[in-house]
Amino acid sequence: MLDKVKNVIVVLSGKGGVGKSTVSTQLALALRATGHKVGLLDIDLCGPSVPYLLGLEGRDIFQCDDGWVPIYTDESKTLAVMSIGFLLKNRTDPVIWRGPKKTMMIKQFLSDVKWDELDYLIIDTPPGTSDEHITVMECLREVPCNGAIIVTTPQGVALDDVRKEITFCKKTGIKLLGIVENMSGFVCPHCTECTNIFSSNGGAELANLAQVPHLGTLPIDPRVGVLAGSTASALDELPDSSTAQILRGIVQHLDALTAVPAIA
């Protein structure tokens, strides 16, 4: 049930291992840190990592008359989370389903979860372009979807896959809000100097080629890695870091597009 959701943002990646779920969770936490009510929906059915990234593993989902009740990270209910990871007995249990069963589960996630009033719903998708993505886009035709953010890394193979994602967005009619280049450079935990370990600026060049905003370049920062397994936002814990600055910029970009003012 998305009738109380003001804005829907889909997060995509061309391939796995680019840090898409980390970006999704930190974006959701950044939106919450700036005064928004946020929902985070993890539809990566075969590799759900959002419960782990937020330290919510082992939490149980309950049903009410209106559907599934998402997991809330705090008493004020400013961040609600839903993932198939909450429905599995063990984190290591594989989800071995064919396409139709995956499609049915995603439709349930989009129609049978009792979201309260949300400023933003962030949908973390599996990598690539598959049945899951097509199902999401079909379901969101009845609900205003603001668009998609693509996460990539500087390597050439990742950038090649992003081109496929851009084509996918065009063919499915979803607006591309921008590209985030992740894992670009390594931040020394001692002096905080950032050193490029892969090629750089690939995300910016691709955004320019596709004529969409380049939302920022996120480095590999061990200090941000320490935040995994908690609901701590880089904006609160590392306010002066480049990661926090980029996330703050993305939040401002989304607020400008959606006309939803931040409180903080």
UniProtKB/Swiss-Prot annotation:
Its cofactor is [4Fe-4S] cluster. SUPFAM superfamilies: P-loop containing nucleoside triphosphate hydrolases. One of its GO terms (biological process) is iron-sulfur cluster assembly. GO terms for cellular component: cytosol. GO terms for molecular function: 4 iron, 4 sulfur cluster binding; ATP binding; ATP-dependent FeS chaperone activity; metal ion binding. Pfam families: ParA. It comes from the Eukaryota. Binds 4 [4Fe-4S] clusters per heterotetramer. Contains two stable clusters in the N-termini of Nubp1 and two labile, bridging clusters between subunits of the Nubp1-Nubp2 heterotetramer. Keywords: 4Fe-4S, ATP-binding, Cytoplasm, Iron, Iron-sulfur, Metal-binding, Nucleotide-binding. ATP binds at residues 14-21. It is found in: Cytoplasm. [4Fe-4S] cluster binds at residues 188, 191. Component of the cytosolic iron-sulfur (Fe/S) protein assembly (CIA) machinery. Required for maturation of extramitochondrial Fe-S proteins. The Nubp1-Nubp2 heterotetramer forms a Fe-S scaffold complex, mediating the de novo assembly of an Fe-S cluster and its transfer to target apoproteins. HAMAP family: Mrp_NBP35 (MF_02040), NUBP2 (MF_03039). Heterotetramer of 2 Nubp1 and 2 Nubp2 chains. Belongs to the Mrp/NBP35 ATP-binding proteins family. NUBP2/CFD1 subfamily. This is Cytosolic Fe-S cluster assembly factor Nubp2 homolog. It comes from Drosophila grimshawi (Hawaiian fruit fly).
